[in-house]
């Protein structure tokens, strides 16, 4: 069943697609951020409920009074399948993928639309992601995102990084009916999509003034558990990417450079050294898991 948006005589420029699974409270702030946009282009929001225990509550559906919001429910099939479903029912020429815990800054959609119009040679766009420095876990996320987006930025403005907390792509560049994302990827689906773009020589262009804050509503222990679980679930996806022969991993020299840059950035009062130690611990855990996985023969 769908909660249909108000009738429109023309397709919106942006179709914002969000997969949700039992996270209605976090989603509220995300949907509110769309209502607070200044001078936005025409847009619609497609919310795919991926088999949540309870249907979307009224306080979610009521955002349909602020902008076109379509809500569809499906049996639990994973985030990739949910995003594919959203893309298939969307109308806009630009597909924008976001997470339920993404918060779009007030001029984000305006900046994204301007960049898309000014750079027709680019087909995909990575929005600039930030963390919430109000908590330690948020400061760790801020440090991680600053480091990745600074060090993986190419001279032409493209980025060797893709994160679907805020990512856009032209509809003409994907097979919407076949699926934008590979549904066999439980985690790491955005990295698999990046590998496909690398194969085509089309890295996403970084839209530096289109800012999305990626919330991390976890305790420190919960974030470490999530990191371990994600690293484990991503391994099969990375095996698929490796089979393609696509070079996407950073080199050991790059890792050392990023480690030094992280230490320098953590000197900012808004981030702090503790964020550096936590982030390094997380990355060491991830590397150990990957080493064990490879040493075991990836069975």
Residue map of PLM features:
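Non-catalytic, C-terminal membrane-associated alpha-helical segments of glycosyltransferases
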Residues: 226-233, 244-299
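Acidic donor-binding loop at a coil-to-helix junction in glycosyltransferase catalytic cores
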Residues: 186-195
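Short aromatic/hydrophobic "clamp" motif used to bind/position activated sugar donors
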Residues: 95
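Glycine-rich, basic loop-to-helix element that forms the pyrophosphate-binding segment
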Residues: 74-90
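Conserved donor NDP-sugar-binding/catalytic core segment of glycosyltransferases
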Residues: 107-139
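Short, flexible, basic/aromatic active-site loop/helix in glycosyltransferases
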Residues: 127, 141-160
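Acidic donor-binding segment of Leloir-type glycosyltransferases
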Residues: 31-73
């Amino acid at each position: 069943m769908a909660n249909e948006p108000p009738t429109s005589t023309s397709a919106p420029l942006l179709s914002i697609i969000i997969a949700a699974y039992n996270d209605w409270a976090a989603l509220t702030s995300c949907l509110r951020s769309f209502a607070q946009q200044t001078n936005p282009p025409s847009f619609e929001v497609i919310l795919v409920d991926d088999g949540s225990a309870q249907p979307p509550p009224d306080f979610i559906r009521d955002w349909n009074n602020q902008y076109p919001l379509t809500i569809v429910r499906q049996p639990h099939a994973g985030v990739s399948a949910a995003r594919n479903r959203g893309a298939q029912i969307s109308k806009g020429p630009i597909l924008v993928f976001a997470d339920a815990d993404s918060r779009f800054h007030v001029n984000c959609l305006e900046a994204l639309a301007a960049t898309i119009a000014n750079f027709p040679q680019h087909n995909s766009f990575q929005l600039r992601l930030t963390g919430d420095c109000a908590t330690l876990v948020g400061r760790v996320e801020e440090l991680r995102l600053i480091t990745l987006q600074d060090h993986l930025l190419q001279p032409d403005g493209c980025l060797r990084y893709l994160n679907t907390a805020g990512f856009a792509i032209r509809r003409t560049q994907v097979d919407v009916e076949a699926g934008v994302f590979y549904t066999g990827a439980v985690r790491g689906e955005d990295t698999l999509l990046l590998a496909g773009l690398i194969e085509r020589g089309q890295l996403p262009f970084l839209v530096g003034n289109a800012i999305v804050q990626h919330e991390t509503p976890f305790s420190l222990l919960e974030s470490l558990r999530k990191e371990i679980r994600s690293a484990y679930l991503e391994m099969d996806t990375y095996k698929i990417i490796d089979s393609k022969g696509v070079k996407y991993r950073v080199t050991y020299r790059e890792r050392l450079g990023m480690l030094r840059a992280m230490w320098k950035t953590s000197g900012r009062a808004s981030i702090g050294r503790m964020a550096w130690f936590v982030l390094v611990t997380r990355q060491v855990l991830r590397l150990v898991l990957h080493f064990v996985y490879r040493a075991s023969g990836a069975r």
